[in-house]
């Protein structure tokens, strides 16, 4: 009887673990894709403001238009939701990693958390800086200073391209390293992540297409996690002490 009860408890724990892993993978995929989408939307709207190369007349006309200012302000309001989605993404990703393997480096895990936190903080600074002129004119009826109107968007772009994406590179590196070491991500994706991280870390580009690199990596990761979530058996019958890797046959539906 005691052996039967112990086996039943072990099976129940495994089933709960399987459901938890499936939920964590699904949530991670959803909020990761949501952050990528909201990030691109908010930055596209905020960067609509005239930049350093704009003439004084272009700057004056842009900020004199209420509709133009509100495009930037919509991007400003979307920005916090992108940040909230990323916070959920980081927490859910770490839950999935912790539940999927016991071979997890504390150093890599902490670096992943810290780099993700700094990345989203710098993204907030970049987007807020790029929209401060539109906000000040919209809410305080201030006058446009062309020199100031040029400086703030440049400052925002510098924070994003030079600082935020370096932290994103560290996040990509650590996520790839954790996934490769534990065997919970495909090897091609993990090694590709090292290339993406190196590109984000070393590139000196200020081109608008560069903004797409990190969100695209997130989209691919989200798609992989959705695939993983579908393959995890919610009634996983793998003893807890044996560990769990998403590639293991007992935990994966075939076909």
Task: Specify the residue positions occupied by each region the protein language model found.
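Hydrophobic, aromatic-enriched alpha-helical segments typical of multi-pass transmembrane helices
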Residues: 2-255
């Amino acid at each position: 009887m005691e052996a039967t009860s112990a086996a039943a408890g072990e099976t129940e724990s495994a089933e709960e673990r399987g459901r938890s892993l499936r939920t964590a993978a699904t949530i991670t995929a959803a909020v990761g894709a949501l952050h990528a989408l909201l990030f691109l939307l908010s930055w596209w709207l905020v960067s609509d403001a005239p930049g350093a190369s704009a003439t004084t007349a272009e700057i004056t006309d842009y900020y004199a238009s209420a509709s133009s200012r509100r495009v930037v302000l919509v991007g400003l309001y979307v920005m916090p939701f992108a940040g909230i989605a990323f916070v959920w993404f980081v927490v859910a990703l770490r839950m999935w990693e912790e539940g999927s393997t016991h071979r997890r480096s504390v150093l890599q895990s902490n670096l992943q958390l810290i780099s993700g936190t700094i990345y989203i903080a710098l993204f907030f600074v970049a987007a807020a800086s790029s929209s401060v002129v539109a906000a000040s004119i919209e809410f305080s009826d201030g006058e446009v200073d062309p020199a100031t109107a040029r400086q703030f968007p440049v400052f925002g772009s510098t924070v994003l391209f030079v600082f935020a994406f370096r932290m994103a590179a560290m996040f990509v590196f650590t996520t790839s390293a954790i996934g490769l070491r534990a065997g919970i991500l495909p090897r091609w994706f993990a090694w590709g992540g090292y290339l993406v991280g190196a590109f984000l870390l070393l590139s000196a580009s200020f081109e608008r297409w560069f903004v797409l690199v990190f969100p695209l990596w997130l989209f691919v990761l989200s798609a992989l996690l959705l695939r993983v979530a579908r393959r995890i058996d919610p009634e996983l019958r793998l003893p807890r002490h044996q560990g769990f890797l998403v590639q293991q046959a007992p935990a994966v539906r075939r076909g």
